[in-house]
Structures are given as C-alpha cells and as structure tokens.
Curated annotation (Swiss-Prot):
Entry annotated with the keyword Secreted: no
Organism in which the protein naturally occurs: Lactococcus lactis subsp. cremoris (strain SK11)
Single GO MF annotation: translation release factor activity, codon specific
Modified residues (N5-methylglutamine): 251
Gene3D superfamilies membership: 3.30.160.20, 3.30.70.1660, Release factor
Xref: NCBIfam families: prfB
Location of this chain's protein in the cell: Cytoplasm
Main location: cytoplasm
GO cellular component terms given for this protein: cytoplasm
Gene label: prfB
Job description of the protein: Peptide chain release factor 2 directs the termination of translation in response to the peptide chain termination codons UGA and UAA.
Lineage: Bacteria, Bacillati, Bacillota, Bacilli, Lactobacillales
Family: Belongs to the prokaryotic/mitochondrial release factor family.
Protein name: Peptide chain release factor 2
Length: 365
C-alpha cells in the first residue's frame, strides 16, 4: 500500500470519526455515564435487582460507545503520527505496521457505523426467529432446516447464546417449523431485516428425475420483550394445551406432557415451546413468545395506519420475497431490497450473512 493511498484513507477515516463525535455528543455522554455510576454507588441500589440490572446494562452500553470512540480516535492519531514519520524517512517495518493499523482502523469504523445504525427502540433486545416452510412439501421443509443451520451458525459465530424454543420435524426430511432464541445485545437489531420470504432454486435431491425446484420459506423475527414493556394478557383469553415433546430430530421424547401450546383466542395467535424439560419452563417461554407476538401485532397495526396515511402500500407478508438463493443453473444469493449479492453461496449457508445484514441496515436508514 502506497503512502499516498494510506494518507487518503486516513483523511476519510478522520472525517468519519469527527462525524461520530458530533452525533455522540461526548460531553452529554460523559454526563450520562457519571449519573448512572452515581446511581450504582447508592446503598439502596440493589434493593430492586431487576431495576439495578437495567441500570448496569445501560451503563455498560454507554461506556462501550464512549470507549470504542476513544479507541478509534487514539488509533487514528497514532497512524497519522506514523505517516508523518514515514514521509520524512522511509522505514519498511514501520510502513507494514501502519498498513496493518490502517486496515484495522477501517474495520473498527465499519463496526462502529453498524452500532450507530442499530438505533431502533428494540434493537438492543434478544430476538426470537421463526422459520415456517411453504407449501413445497419435503423440498420446502428441507430448505427450512438449511436456513435454521445458517442462522444458528451465524449466531454462534457472533457470540450469541442460541437456544431452540420449539422444533417440529418434517414429514421426510427437514422441519415443519422452528423457533430460535438469540440471546445477546443487539440480536434483534441485526436480525430484524431477515423477516420475509426466502426463495430457494436448486436441483432437488428428493426428485428422482433431477428436476429444478423452487421453494419458499417464511422467516419471522420478533424482539424478546424485557420488563420495561408491559403487555397485558388476560388468562381468560389464553387456551393452554400440553403434549409430549421431543428434541430436534425426534430424540429424547418425553413420557410426560411437557410441551406447551398457547392459543390467544381473540387473535388466533398460536405459540408453543417444547425444548424445556419442564412444563412450567415451556409455559413461561411460550408466554414470552405470545407477548412478543401480540406487541408486534399492535406495532404492525400502527405502522399500517401510518402507511395508509402516506399512501404507502408496501407491507411484510407471505408475498414479500426478500432474498433468492440460486444453486442451479448458477450460484448466486441476492437480496431483492438492497441489491446486495454474492456468488459464495456455500459460505452464506455456513452463516456468513453479515454482508446482507449490513447492507440492509444501511438501506433502511
């Protein structure tokens, strides 16, 4: 990398970091951190442990923003100093170090830009992702299991705790439905753009004639609501059924009815949890899913009213295809909203979907 190229990169990075400083309002950020630390130092702070944990989480999030900004700014200043020294006197080892630092700084800035883009009210929350294959039989159900693998690998690679809440086996292969919980900060923010219909085109391994098939699978994503958002669910409105449950692939089938299915009678929403070992645990998880769905339903209604006033007729529905995965006659994964695409389809199916997530966050600004 030539010094002139490094200089141009650092000038661009400097503009971005200055922009971060303006948007963050560092003085206000420091004041907010100080106020939270003062609250945490009070003798009665731990009297309400749930409230205390929220304060700690908020403090950690603000400190992370502040510390990450300072780290980028310090790295930029160090790189600029090294560039000045190299312009005065060549040093091969120092230039290699500067190239590595410039690359690392660019990566830090890109990550920080994404953090700033996660600014929606529920982006910081855990996420529940559901996969529902379409009407393509075994081929569609197998496609659902491929997407499950893709998302679980992505979550594990990014340090999220990944938990299967409910899993229903397919008739021959794959799955009929699955609910996956992603635990970690910003899980919902990263995954919310995955909501929609995912289309697969391939030569079906289940077709003896080796014909090309097109399958569709719907993905839904909801924030897992915390205690700061109250959703009232009347006991009289909920019908509970219990049944024997087993793990993915039909393993460890329980001899007692630990699986729980909840039906919200007024809306017809049905949720179920099967993976906990106890009926009580499954009921709690199913109720949390139901509350998230009811809250999402209310938010969708409000958004529909806004869209109607604006004359915006677009909506998330079964017909809203967001991404195509073509295995034959060529290999290509393309997002129909952002235009982002890649031919590295095997990497995508192994969970490397950051390019699509990042493109959606920028497109949705």
């Amino acid at each position: 990398m030539e010094l002139s190229e490094i200089r141009n990169l650092l000038e661009g990075y400097s503009e971005k970091i200055n922009g971060f400083r303006d948007s963050l309002d560092l003085d206000r950020l420091e004041e907010e951190i100080a106020l939270l630390e003062n609250d945490m130092a009070q003798p009665e702070f731990w009297n309400d442990q749930a409230a205390a944990q929220k304060v700690i989480d908020e403090s950690n999030a603000l400190k992370a923003k502040y510390d990450n900004y300072q780290a980028m700014n310090n790295m930029l200043e160090e790189a600029q100093t090294m560039l000045e020294m190299l312009q005065e006197e060549a040093d091969e080892d120092m230039q290699v170090e500067l190239e590595e630092m410039t690359t690392a700084l660019g990566q830090k800035i890109e990550s920080y830009e994404l953090e700033i883009m996660l600014n929606q009210p529920y982006d910081h929350m855990n996420a529940v992702l559901e996969i529902h294959p379409g009407s393509g039989g075994t081929e569609s159900q197998d496609w659902g299991s491929m997407l499950m693998r893709m998302y679980t690998r992505w979550g594990e690679a990014h340090g999220f705790k990944v938990e299967i809440l409910d899993y229903q086996d397919g008739d021959v292969a794959g799955l009929k439905s699955v609910a996956i919980r992603f635990v970690g900060r910003n899980a919902y923010g990263f995954l919310r753009g995955e909501k929609g219909v995912h289309r697969l085109v391939r030569i079906s391994p289940f077709d003896s004639a080796n014909r090309r098939h097109t399958s569709f699978t719907s993905v839904d994503v909801m924030p897992e609501l915390d205690d700061s958002i109250e959703v009232e669910v009347r006991d009289a409105d909920v019908k509970m059924d219990t049944f024997r449950s087993g793990g993915a692939g039909g393993q460890n089938v329980n001899k007692v009815s630990t699986g729980v299915r909840l039906t919200h009678v007024p809306t017809g929403i049905v949720v179920q949890s099967t993976m906990d070992r106890t009926q009580y645990g499954n009921r709690d998880k199913a109720m949390a899913m139901l509350k998230s769905k009811l809250y999402q339903l209310e938010m969708d209604k409000k958004q529909a009213e806004v869209d109607e006033l604006r004359g915006d007729q677009s909506e998330i529905s079964w017909g809203s295809q967001i991404r195509s995965y073509v295995f034959m006659p060529y290999q290509l994964v393309k997002d129909t909203r952002t235009g982002y695409e890649t031919g590295q389809i095997s990497n995508v199916m192994d969970g490397e979907i950051d390019g699509f997530i990042n493109a959606y966050l920028r497109w949705n600004l």
